[in-house]
Design a protein with these regions (language model features):
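Short beta-strand-centered segment that lines the nucleotide-binding/catalytic pocket of NTP-utilizing
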Residues: 49-64
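P-loop (Walker A) phosphate-binding loop of NTP-binding proteins
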Residues: 31
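Conserved lysine of the Walker
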Residues: 36
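Short phosphate-coordinating micro-motif centered on Lys-Gly-acidic
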Residues: 45, 89-147
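N-terminal pre-Walker A segment at the start of P-loop NTPase domains
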Residues: 1-15
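Conserved nucleotide-sensing/catalytic segment adjacent to the nucleotide-binding pocket
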Residues: 63-103
Length: 147
């Protein structure tokens, strides 16, 4: 998938947000400034969250209320020490969990999640989705085919 600008990236996030269910997990990867938080802003809109979405870089976790709670984590600063936060509280907290830099968690990742790698390109963003587990596969299918 490819998006030409921030508006398209947010719009795709919003489409995914409409499809999300309780305990869905999304892992976002990409270099600094790739658009991870921008994508999450759209996703939050799809979850009917009206609060301003900010990067959790320095706070590690931000929580928002909408159709489902959104737990927005940035684990870059915990340097692979998943034990420094109670991941289970978010992963099984009845909401949607978005983890920026989630690939750094290694074995601490849940069994099922949808991963999105955002790559900067000159005129936009190249998006690579990878589904792990049947729920994530279904979610990706719905996102790609508008089911």
């Amino acid at each position: 998938m490819y998006t030409k600008n921030e508006e398209e990236l947010q719009s795709l996030g919003e489409r995914l947000g409409y499809l999300l269910e309780k305990n869905d997990v999304l892992i976002l990867t990409g270099e600094l400034g790739a658009g991870k938080t921008t994508f999450t802003k759209g996703l939050a809109k799809g979850l009917q969250i009206t609060q301003m979405i900010k990067s959790p870089t320095y706070t590690i976790v931000r929580e928002y209320e909408g159709r489902l709670p959104l737990y927005h984590l940035d684990v870059y600063r915990i340097e692979g020490d998943a034990d420094s936060i109670d991941l289970d509280e978010f992963l099984f907290g009845g909401g949607v969990t978005v983890i920026e830099w989630g690939n750094l968690l290694g074995d601490a990742l849940p069994d099922t999640y949808l991963e999105l790698e955002i790559l900067k390109e000159e005129d936009g963003r190249r998006l690579h989705f990878q589904a792990k587990g049947s729920r994530a596969e279904k979610l990706l299918e719905e996102l790609q085919h508008g089911v």
